[in-house]
Amino acid sequence: MADKLFSIRNYFFLGSYQSCIGEALKFSSKNEEEKQEKDVYLYRSYIAQGQAFIPLKEIPAATKSADLAAVRRYAEFRNNPAAKKKILAEVQEEVASRNIKSEIAAVLAATILNEADLSQDAFRAVSRFEGLEARASKVFILIKMNKRKLAIGEVKKMNQIDEDATLSQLANALVTSFGASGKVKDALYIYSEMSDKYGRTTDLEMHQAVVSILTQDYAAAEELLESALERDNKDADVLINSIVSAQLNEKDDDVVERFISQLKHEHPNHPWVIDFNEKEAEFDRVASDSRA
């Protein structure tokens, strides 16, 4: 039986959000579960594009769907800075009480906690769930926590479910990127194959650039990041890696400063920006004390 939602999900996982939206808007089904799943990826794509106001407007606050309620809460988290602290506390309470009702809700809870740089809580959010998206979330979190061996274990479980699935391939590429130096280029082959098969996306080019940096091919990294920026010049990960690439390619200081300024402007609450601002303030304090 054909998977009617395959293209919608696949475009989302690849970071091709406009294509996901296009497929979702064309989608037609009488099955309520299919329509709801379509809406989940449609609205998550709008959020990823910085248009969180759309799900906030279209998903009723009193929706009975646990998945859509989780999407709406994530949209509120991204759209309303004043609500972030309250939402974060609410998510942490749900994780602590094991009161997360669905895999999508768990993945979105983990996403919120990750964005708050609370990796351990994020892992707890998805720990009970065994679907591919939950396991892919675990892999990302474990790599972020520098626990590659555990991440490999999750990838093996994903491969047992479906080794050809896009999420399994992306998870394989991620753990390979941070493995033995002799195998890092294997990750580049995976990303390149996916680009050839499904088309280039901001996410795929960003990951290819990271592998290029790890293999010291700085010119290739710069080219890939420039292409990614043409697609989305506000993406936080692309901007962060552009800062790294500019420094490695020995660009003028004003180029690096421009990327930093843009990142600060677009993502003032990003963990990288918060850490940078703290270090910058500490440097200024030490410099001021030394002049006193």
From Swiss-Prot:
It is a peripheral membrane protein. Keywords: Cytoplasm, Cytoplasmic vesicle, ER-Golgi transport, Golgi apparatus, Membrane, Protein transport, Transport. It is found in: Cytoplasm; Golgi apparatus membrane; Cytoplasmic vesicle, COPI-coated vesicle membrane. GO terms for cellular component: COPI vesicle coat; Golgi membrane; mitochondrion. Its main location: cytoplasm. SUPFAM superfamilies: TPR-like. GO terms for molecular function: structural molecule activity. GO terms for biological process: endoplasmic reticulum to Golgi vesicle-mediated transport; intra-Golgi vesicle-mediated transport; protein transport; retrograde vesicle-mediated transport, Golgi to endoplasmic reticulum. Belongs to the COPE family. The coatomer is a cytosolic protein complex that binds to dilysine motifs and reversibly associates with Golgi non-clathrin-coated vesicles, which further mediate biosynthetic protein transport from the ER, via the Golgi up to the trans Golgi network. The coatomer complex is required for budding from Golgi membranes, and is essential for the retrograde Golgi-to-ER transport of dilysine-tagged proteins. Oligomeric complex that consists of at least the alpha, beta, beta', gamma, delta, epsilon and zeta subunits. This is Coatomer subunit epsilon.
